[in-house]
């Protein structure tokens, strides 16, 4: 399986269609409703053999209710717009998501800014996290920006990694 090969399974929403037009699915949910959605998603993933303890909300934004509900449902890592939080130790590794599409801009000036920001972060030894909507990769500008981000991060010593939770190294193993 892909998981045994090192890939991470990350829960990225459950019923986004109900809220997509307004905001990210978990951006404004109270704890009770977030709890219901997380329980439902967890059961579905368990049924198909993809149960995970890692969570990244659509739009990278989570409500306080969602943050409260995640550990109650066994989740151990939250990846949001500004960092990765170990929900067991409550420690956060700060690292901003740099993205194109799906809530992020796609204009040429944004692509240039994204590349410069990623290079600055990598040069300073930070964690470079990228997100791109697949449909944006059909366009040459966003595609080249993402390739440049990866090349520059590697050039400055960043190592590719997946989101992973480990009690010995909270959250910082993801990049």
Spans of features found by a protein language model:
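Alpha-helical scaffold elements lining the catalytic groove of polysaccharide deacetylases
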Residues: 17-46, 85-124, 142
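Glycan-processing catalytic domains of CAZymes
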Residues: 9-12, 54, 77, 94-96, ...
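Anion (oxyanion) recognition and catalysis
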Residues: 3, 46, 71, 122, ...
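Short, electropositive alpha-helical surface patch
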Residues: 63-78, 147
């Amino acid at each position: 399986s892909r998981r045994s090969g090192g890939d991470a399974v990350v829960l990225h929403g459950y019923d986004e269609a109900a809220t997509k037009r307004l905001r990210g699915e978990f951006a404004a949910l109270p704890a009770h409703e977030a709890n219901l959605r997380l329980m439902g998603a967890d059961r579905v993933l368990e049924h198909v053999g993809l149960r995970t303890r890692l969570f990244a909300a659509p739009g990278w934004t989570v409500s306080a209710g969602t943050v409260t509900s995640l550990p109650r449902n066994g989740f151990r890592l939250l990846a949001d717009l500004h960092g990765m939080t170990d929900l067991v130790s409550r420690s956060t590794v700060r690292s901003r998501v740099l993205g194109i599409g799906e809530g992020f801009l796609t204009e040429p000036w944004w692509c240039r800014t994204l590349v410069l920001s990623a290079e600055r972060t990598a040069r300073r030894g930070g964690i470079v996290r990228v997100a791109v909507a697949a449909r944006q990769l059909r366009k040459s500008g966003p595609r080249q920006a993402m390739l440049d981000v990866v090349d520059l991060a590697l050039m400055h010593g960043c190592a590719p990694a997946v989101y992973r939770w480990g009690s010995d190294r909270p959250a910082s193993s993801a990049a």
